[in-house]
């Protein structure tokens, strides 16, 4: 762990409070501001490892929660997990068989970064497009979608694609996002189905 991480107050707070990463606070803040999750919602979390959003989701809903990631996710009581690629039709089918249609899809995933900003941003947008396709396949009409993306040249295209599928779409940068980051969340409510 680098010194940047050890000096990061949000990271240290997350560890102290038992969260797996600082990302927990991003979802908490989004929920407080936009109320995207209801108490009885069934939810799929794409790119769920290490499980920090799953930890938060478990406290926000009494519904079923499924985390999907390429990497294994350590057990969290009351959470179902599926190891696989969200772009794989077999994984999508398994998710739908496990939960049926759901009320919310969240995605805090990011591709492995290469250090080349434009390349990494393009890969993040492509991942966002795949997550949107997944969401459209499993969401109930009226459902919500929350996804992390990165601002850049291709961001408006992803935003427009999401706006075409949902009645209300907003962008939001959380307080827990590091200074200088191009990270932004898209909060999409009321899936057109």
UniProtKB/Swiss-Prot annotation:
SUPFAM superfamilies noted in UniProt: S-adenosyl-L-methionine-dependent methyltransferases
Cellular component GO terms held in the UniProt record: cytoplasm
GO molecular function: rRNA (uridine-2'-O-)-methyltransferase activity
Cross-referenced InterPro entries: RNA_methyltr_RlmE, RNA_MeTrfase_FtsJ_dom, rRNA-MeTfrase_E, SAM-dependent_MTases_sf
Reactions this protein catalyses: uridine(2552) in 23S rRNA + S-adenosyl-L-methionine = 2'-O-methyluridine(2552) in 23S rRNA + S-adenosyl-L-homocysteine + H(+)
Residues the record lists as binding S-adenosyl-L-methionine: 51, 53, 69, 85, 108
Compartments, record wording: Cytoplasm
Record flagged with keyword Transferase: yes
EC number(s) from the headed UniProt entry: 2.1.1.166
Protein name (Swiss-Prot/TrEMBL): Ribosomal RNA large subunit methyltransferase E
Species in which this protein is naturally found: Methanoregula boonei (strain DSM 21154 / JCM 14090 / 6A8)
Source organism phylogeny: Archaea, Methanobacteriati, Methanobacteriota, Stenosarchaea group, Methanomicrobia
Gene: rlmE
């Amino acid at each position: 762990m680098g010194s940047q991480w050890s000096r990061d107050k949000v990271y240290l707070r997350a560890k102290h409070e038992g969260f797996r990463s600082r990302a927990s606070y991003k979802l908490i803040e989004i929920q407080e501001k936009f109320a995207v999750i209801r108490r009885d919602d069934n939810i799929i979390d794409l790119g769920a490892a290490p499980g920090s959003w799953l930890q938060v989701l478990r406290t926000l809903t009494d519904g079923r929660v499924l985390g999907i990631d390429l990497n294994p996710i350590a057990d969290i009581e009351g959470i179902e997990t599926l190891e696989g690629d969200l772009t794989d039709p077999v994984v999508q089918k398994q998710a739908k068989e496990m939960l049926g249609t759901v009320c919310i899809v969240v995605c805090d995933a990011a591709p492995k970064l290469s250090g080349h900003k434009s390349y990494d941003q393009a890969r993040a947008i492509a991942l966002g497009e795949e997550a949107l396709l997944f969401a459209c396949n499993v969401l109930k009409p009226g459902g919500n979608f929350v996804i992390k993306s990165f601002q850049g040249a291709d961001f408006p295209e992803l935003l427009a694609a999401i706006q075409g599928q949902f009645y209300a779409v907003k962008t939001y940068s959380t307080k827990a996002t590091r200074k200088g980051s191009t990270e932004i969340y898209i909060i999409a409510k009321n899936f057109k189905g």
